[in-house]
Amino acid sequence: MKKKNLVLQVFIAFIAGLVLGVVLWLAKVDISGYVKIVSPFGQVLVAMLKMIVIPVIFLSLIDGAASVPTKEFGKIGIKVIVWYFLTSLFAAVLGSVLAIGFNPGSGEAQQAAWKSLINTQNTSEIASKANNSLADVFISMFQNPFKALADGNFLAIIVFSIAFGLALKMISERAEYSGKVKTLLEIIDVAKEAIFKIVDWILAYSPIGVFALTSVNFASYGSSLFGPYIKLTIGVVLGIVAMVLIVYPLMMAVTLKVNPFKVLMKIKEPMLTAFVTRSSAAALPVSLRVAKEDLKISENISSFALPLGSTINMDGVCIHLPMFAILAANMFGVKVTFVSLSVLVLTTVLASVGAGGVPGGSLMLLFIILQNMKLSPDQIAIIVGLALGINPILDMFETMNNVTGDIVCTYSVAKLSGLVDEEE
């Protein structure tokens, strides 16, 4: 109930900010005084999110990586992990292709509107920072973890966190370390929950921040923001529809030789639950029941593959993040190259591991993407303000996509492994 109330509050704050901002923009009045008073309330929200994003990702990735199956699950566990990785990778690539195609924030009129934004930081400076060579990017992934934490080098933080979590999982199988590793993971889990509580507090403040950010953005740039909003929404929804109705069915048809739409019809209940609740955790019990009763999947695989998927598989989010990245690139004059797109895809896929259970997880991942683009705090605030406004709508589709991907993966691996009790 609290979550629904918060969503409603954020939506009302967004609409109120939009209306007030457009009225001020149409009135052609001097808004410098208004911006000076109201803007800090939005900046505080961005600052709090920036404060919490590194510990959230660091602890979540360690916990997520430490929970992946190792040799006790054998080939089946490996198949599940590989399937999740490949679908997330495909979703990130699809999202990038759609983002380039829709190109939100482009066009002469909008470029003129963004001109004042581009001047807030030297364009060539941003481009030189954001478009390093692929070799430079690869080397930076293995930076000293403490320096990476201090510098905000998210790729290095992600790589180290995943490696550390996997290492903990490996040494936990040795008798002399199993108890110590269990204790350490319990401490990490408690620390993660404490951080999540802070995230809840920040999200409770978010309606105020959303109102401030939205009203200032629309008061400054008016109708030029409507085009990007429409393109973003259409692009993300189109990508998710493509994943659910084209990509997943093709994967099942090719690998399993079954009618994929019969499978999708059987899982419509968890899909609808995910769409309505915007929560993979809320849909998980329904997914487990449907997997057992309707898809006839052995509990030996569904009991670990589905919970694991709700943690590490975020196909829907992998589609929408590139949209905001391209919008930011257009707004702030960042040149998009093959290298920068490759880094975007890699960062999106790696960062999604462990972020599924994070409150406002997609927003945290957006911060990573924008930080990686070397944008200034003011520029990040503008993009985050735009994202917060439509996040509740996009989140419904993304969560449905995530849950669908989890079940399709589980069913496909089970079918290939002979762990489906009845033939379709």
Where are these regions (language model features)?
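Signature of multi-pass transmembrane helix bundles
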Residues: 7-11, 18-26, 30, 34, ...
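Transmembrane helix-bundle signature of multi-pass membrane transporters/permeases
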Residues: 44, 80-85, 89, 163, ...
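Membrane-interfacial loop-to-helix junctions in multi-pass transporters
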Residues: 49-51, 152-156, 203, 238-239, ...
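Transmembrane helix boundary and interhelical junction motifs in multipass membrane proteins
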Residues: 53-57, 209, 279-287, 318-324, ...
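Juxtamembrane helix-boundary/capping and inter-helix hinge elements in multi-pass membrane proteins
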Residues: 64-71, 107, 182, 221, ...
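Membrane-embedded alpha-helical segments of transport systems
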Residues: 82-94, 153-161, 205, 309-320, ...
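Transmembrane alpha-helical segments and their short flanking loops
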Residues: 107, 322-424
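Helix-loop-helix junctions within the multi-pass membrane cores of secondary transporters/permeases
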Residues: 269, 275-352, 410, 420-423
